[in-house]
Curated annotation (Swiss-Prot):
Similarity comment: Belongs to the acyl carrier protein (ACP) family.
Name of the molecule in the record: Acyl carrier protein
Gene Ontology biological process terms, A to Z: lipid A biosynthetic process
Lineage: Bacteria, Pseudomonadati, Campylobacterota, Epsilonproteobacteria, Campylobacterales
Chief location bin: cytoplasm
Originating organism: Aliarcobacter butzleri (strain RM4018) (Arcobacter butzleri)
Encoding gene, per UniProt annotation: acpP
C-alpha cells in the first residue's frame, strides 16, 4: 500500500490533479488530463523518486497508475 501512496503522491505533484481522482486504474492522459510532455516529466519524477531508470520503450507502456506500480515493483 505504501508504494501506491508514493506513486499517487508523485502523480498528484507532477500532474497537479486532485488526489481523489488518482486511482490505480487511472489513465494519465485520458483520466487525469496529462499530455505527452506531462507523461515524460512524470516518468522522470518516478525515476528520481524510486532510483530506477525507465527506458523509453518501457515508459511508453506505462499508461496508468497500476502500470507504474507494476513496473517499479519489478524493476526497483
Amino acid at each position: 500500500m505504501a508504494l501506491l501512496d508514493d506513486v499517487k503522491a508523485v502523480v498528484v505533484e507532477q500532474l497537479d490533479c486532485d488526489p481523489a481522482e488518482v486511482k490505480e486504474d487511472s489513465k494519465f492522459i485520458e483520466d487525469l488530463g496529462a499530455d505527452s510532455l506531462d507523461v515524460v516529466e512524470l516518468v522522470m519524477a518516478l525515476e528520481e523518486k524510486f532510483d530506477i531508470e525507465i527506458p523509453d520503450e518501457d515508459a511508453e507502456k506505462i499508461l496508468t497508475v497500476a502500470d507504474a506500480i507494476k513496473y517499479i515493483e519489478n524493476n526497483a
